A protein has these predicted regions:
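Extracellular, repeat-based ectodomains that mediate carbohydrate processing or recognition
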Residues: 1-262
Length: 264
């Protein structure tokens, strides 16, 4: 998914699609073999931020309009659209979009009034029929996002979130049937989160957590392999702050940390 107001998608047939926002409307242009089509308007009264997703069957666009959240689908011959939610609006802090065959899934987080918590929901469409939203959990957002997503395989994703007692949990979502596993604990720490990085690889989950205390900071690692929990361990500690990143290269797991000195 993308979050700027101009984006491109290359379809399976090799055709390039350019989508852009202008003066309250969303347009697209088709480019093929060096020639471009005229601009075609997709929607009016749209917000500048919209998301685009491409599948073998066509292209999806999701945006907020004056009537609610709208999902448009293009089957490479015509556009169809429908309102999928009327009550998200500005209360929605993040929304993610997934497809698998005839199934479509929306994962979104709603801010709770007069609280630092949010509520995480999943809503699925099967064979052109939308089901009622299902609540995943009440969550406490991370510093830069309410939740994280990792892909186990083509049919499953993992949803990572934090609850009010600062425990980080995860649930697996089957994109084919929309079923979710029960919540599992990933990491529990009482120290405030400064930065976090989560990596999903097949049935493995790895988390790097930069916790900042009053007098020192800790970089904590924990992993899950084949359903077996690896004991959390502190791999760095000191009076520094910064950001952290997990990545995999040639079968090896690396932890990267950018440090900035704290002046006391």
């Amino acid at each position: 998914m993308y979050s700027s107001n101009i984006k491109t998608i290359r379809a399976c047939n090799g055709m390039l699609f350019v989508f852009y926002y202008s003066q309250g409307s969303i347009f697209f242009v088709k480019i093929h073999k060096g020639s471009s089509s005229a601009s075609v308007k997709i929607a009016d009264n749209a917000s500048p931020m919209f998301s685009v997703w491409c599948t073998d069957n066509g292209i999806y666009i999701m945006f907020n309009g004056d009537q609610g959240t709208v999902l448009c689908f293009y089957n490479y011959s015509r556009w169809v659209s429908r309102i999928i939610a009327k009550d998200l609006g500005e209360s929605c802090s993040r929304i993610s979009f997934f497809t698998d065959g005839e199934s479509v899934h929306l994962l979104y987080s709603i801010k709770n009034i007069n609280s630092n918590t949010e509520s995480l929901f999943i809503r699925s469409m099967k064979k052109d029929k939308w089901e009622q939203p299902k609540k995943v959990s009440d969550i406490m957002p991370f510093p830069n996002t309410p939740y994280f997503i990792g892909r186990e395989n083509n049919d499953k994703i993992k949803i990572y979130y934090r609850i009010s007692d600062k425990t980080i949990k995860y649930r697996s979502l089957n994109l084919c049937d929309g079923n979710m596993t029960e919540a599992e604990n990933l990491l529990a720490t009482s120290m405030p989160c400064y930065d976090i990085s989560i990596l999903t690889k097949n049935d493995e989950s790895h988390i790097l957590y930069l916790a900042q205390g009053m007098y020192s900071s800790q970089l904590i690692y924990k992993g899950i392999k084949s359903g077996r929990q690896i004991k959390a361990r502190v791999i760095w500690e000191g009076q520094l702050s910064g950001s952290c990143l997990l990545f995999c290269n040639n079968g090896r797991l690396y932890a990267l940390m950018y440090l900035s000195l704290i002046h006391i």
